[in-house]
A protein has these predicted regions:
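Structural motif
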Residues: 8, 87-89, 113-115, 145, ...
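Phosphate-binding active sites in nucleotide-utilizing proteins
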Residues: 237-312
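Amide-donor transfer/coupling interface in amidating biosynthetic enzymes
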Residues: 179-226, 235-236, 348-434
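Cysteine-nucleophile active-site neighborhood
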Residues: 290-362
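Internal gly/pro-rich beta-alpha loop/helix module
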Residues: 122-231
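ATP-dependent carboxylate-amine ligase catalytic core
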Residues: 2-108, 112, 116-142, 152-156
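A short helix->loop->beta-strand "cap" motif at the edges of active sites that frequently abuts
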Residues: 110, 166, 312-316
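Residues that mark the start of a beta-strand
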Residues: 6, 34-37, 238, 264, ...
Length: 434
């Protein structure tokens, strides 16, 4: 059973500084020569990009619903075999959601660090820390870190207020040079933050003066029951994948699955007007921010021509969210300006000022459920009838996302987690029916 020092970084709510602290810890321990593996709770794409920049290693999603307990167990056990430290960043507040960050921490016995923003707060900090530590008796609790502290005197007030059996891990001062900027789907992508490495190093410098600079106790991660090797259902298939600032919402586990199924992966950038590799058998257009680059994408004739030629040849195209928007006739922004897109999927996408959809999704296929999630601000108006529709497995408000087919194209707003159904993923890229 592989074992590795591990911490679960959580908070009483969103906006407390979990990502800044997790990224700072990853950068700190990496600078100390340690191999750091970071995971992000939930289906988010943006936080993992920043955490990858900090740690120097791919960041996988951990989610008891989307990834499944066995999938999470396999990812953690694999990381524990090679890493010197595992960090898991939670989502929302520690006990929010079903399943929650606390459920994940308890399932794998990972001790929790509570990051609490103390701006405009003093002794109430201790009450919040006490509640987080005691609300659930089986929760392994490591200690508490005060964030956005105003002064040394402020830090001392906070420390003195803590009950004696709650560990004070230290504090992070209020510092605009550490905070990470945000945009409408969450944090900015790493390449959009000019001084990102300086911010990460500043956070690491501050955290070096806390107890979190020390390695925590090791956690043993039991491996899941051995499963047989995956069939090489995509052996010899060459799959082209769009990857750049406009199309970046890609789970590392999805790429690993395609590789395990035998596919050869090749990447290209529509934003840089690169063609689809000419001998590709299938194409994946992931989600991202096409709305921020609509004019450039519309002007890039080389990429557009290659994608249209791929479709005309009847080769499979799988498009999710922003990738689906790129295939539409046109994209209209929040100010009413319309930009032509590829015209391969009948319909128009229109950006909204508020969420159009958010939540977990499950799509029933011929080979069982495919899990994933949805998170978008655009609305699609299309004459196409859905060939399938996902459902909300969490019972949340709103309907499941539609799946559309137009020729060799399969498109949906749903971001699929392909390891939840490898056979369906193989069918998608083979042009089969899912």
């Amino acid at each position: 059973m592989p074992a590795c020092p591990a911490l679960f970084v959580s908070a009483p709510a969103s906006g407390q500084g979990k990502t800044s602290v997790t990224a700072g810890l990853a950068r700190l321990h990496r600078r100390l020569g340690r191999r750091v593996r970071v995971f992000k709770t939930g289906p988010d794409f943006l936080d993992p990009m920043l955490l990858e920049r900090a740690s120097g290693a791919p960041v996988n999603a951990l989610d008891l619903g989307m990834v499944g307990e066995a999938g999470c167990r396999a990812l953690l056990a694999d990381a524990a075999r090679d890493a010197d430290l595992i960090l898991i960043e939670g989502v929302m507040g520690l006990f929010d959601g079903t399943p929650s960050s606390a459920d994940l921490a308890v399932a794998f016995g990972v001790p929790v660090v509570a990051v609490i923003s103390v701006k405009s707060m003093a002794q109430t900090f201790a009450a919040i820390a006490f509640g987080l530590a005691r609300f659930r008796a089986d929760l392994p609790f490591h200690g508490v870190l005060a964030n956005r502290v105003g002064s040394a005197r402020h830090a001392e007030l906070l420390r003195q207020a803590l009950p004696g059996d709650l560990r004070w891990l230290g504090h992070v001062p209020a510092d605009a040079g550490i905070a990470l900027p945000e945009r409408h789907l969450g944090l900015h992508q790493p390449n959009d933050i000019d001084d990102l490495d300086a911010r990460l190093d500043r956070a690491a410098d501050v955290l070096a003066n806390t107890a979190l600079a020390e390695l925590p106790p090791a956690v043993a991660f039991a491996e899941p029951d051995a499963a047989g090797p995956l069939p090489r259902a995509l052996a010899g298939k060459r799959i082209a994948i769009a990857r750049d600032a406009a199309f970046s919402f890609i789970y590392p586990a999805n790429l690993a699955l395609l590789d395990a199924l035998g596919a050869q992966l090749r990447f290209f950038s529509p934003l840089a007007d690169e063609p689809v590799p000419g001998d590709s058998d299938a194409l994946f257009l992931p989600g991202g921010y096409p709305e921020l680059h609509a004019a450039a994408l519309a002007a890039n004739a080389t990429s557009a021509g290659a994608i249209r030629a791929h479709a005309a040849a009847g080769k499979p195209i799988v498009a999710e969210c922003g990738g689906m928007v790129y295939l539409c006739d046109a994209l209209t922004d929040v100010d009413g300006a319309t930009t032509p897109m590829l015209g391969l999927l009948p319909g128009r996408a229109t950006m909204q000022r508020r969420f159009a959809a958010l939540g977990m999704q499950q799509l029933d296929t011929r080979t069982g459920p495919m899990r994933g999630h949805t998170f978008h601000y655009s609305r699609l108006d299309t004459p196409l009838e859905p060939v399938a529709a996902a459902v909300r497995p969490d019972g949340g408000a709103g309907s499941g996302e539609a799946v559309y087919r137009a020729g060799s194209i399969v498109a949906t707003y749903m971001h699929m987690y392909w390891p939840s159904n490898p056979a369906a993923a193989a069918a998608l890229f083979s042009g089969g029916t899912i």
